[in-house]
């Protein structure tokens, strides 16, 4: 299965910059699956600019409710209508800045699945939690609280909703720091074991992305690690050439 390279633009990007970015991606054939998650207002313009290129689009959050009197919230159904196929949920910046709990992330994931979106559920520990030896415990608790039953096929018998996990150590996001390869491999193995326990057969194959200061210079070594099914890329996804370089590193794996 090709690795997934997902770009999280966060609150960056402009309408004026869409054309050049899309032009760089359109002819590319890196061998990895590409997903770009721009700010919600840019999803439809970027979709149009990509002009059918094999690049999926995603959102960075969605609301628990599908519609109604919820000022400022993002409807999962509307995101799908705009062209999104995926949605990032539970990113550490959302958990910290908006006090989102794992229970809220779980409800958002249910809503996303109902709207036909694939949830990318983020987990990760702080520097203090890693230093105190609690990293795996914290991440397992986030998984236990954030993953809906739909991902195990427990809601509609025989129907397993697709989902993706993204492990992002909080202290590595945007800092230029990355954990050691041994630490990444150990955490991904721990996540895989937790997914098997929690989701059964579905958990054995669910992709686990690594995120946190992924860049062209370290992508190949990170993407070659066991149980790393791709990358959730932040700052490096804002430049098409860097994003494609990371995708090319995945293809060489």
UniProtKB/Swiss-Prot annotation:
Biological-process GO terms, alphabetical: gluconeogenesis; glyceraldehyde-3-phosphate biosynthetic process; glycerol catabolic process; glycolytic process
Active site, per annotation: 91 (electrophile), 168 (proton acceptor)
Any single Gene Ontology cellular-component annotation: cytosol
Keyword Ribosomal protein part of the UniProt annotation: no
Enzyme category, top tier: isomerase
Entry EC number(s): 5.3.1.1
Pathway where this protein functions: Carbohydrate biosynthesis; gluconeogenesis; Carbohydrate degradation; glycolysis; D-glyceraldehyde 3-phosphate from glycerone phosphate: step 1/1
PROSITE patterns: TIM_1, TIM_2
Subcellular location: Cytoplasm
InterPro entries: Aldolase_TIM (IPR013785), TIM_sf (IPR035990), TrioseP_Isoase_bac/euk (IPR022896), Triosephosphate_isomerase (IPR000652), Triosephosphate_isomerase_AS (IPR020861)
GO molecular function: triose-phosphate isomerase activity
Catalytic activity: D-glyceraldehyde 3-phosphate = dihydroxyacetone phosphate
Residues that hold substrate according to the record: 8-10, 174, 213, 234-235
Keyword Zinc: no
Keywords annotated in UniProt: Cytoplasm, Gluconeogenesis, Glycolysis, Isomerase
NCBIfam families: tim (TIGR00419)
Stated family: Belongs to the triosephosphate isomerase family.
Assembly: Homodimer.
Role of this protein: Involved in the gluconeogenesis. Catalyzes stereospecifically the conversion of dihydroxyacetone phosphate (DHAP) to D-glyceraldehyde-3-phosphate (G3P).
Protein name: Triosephosphate isomerase
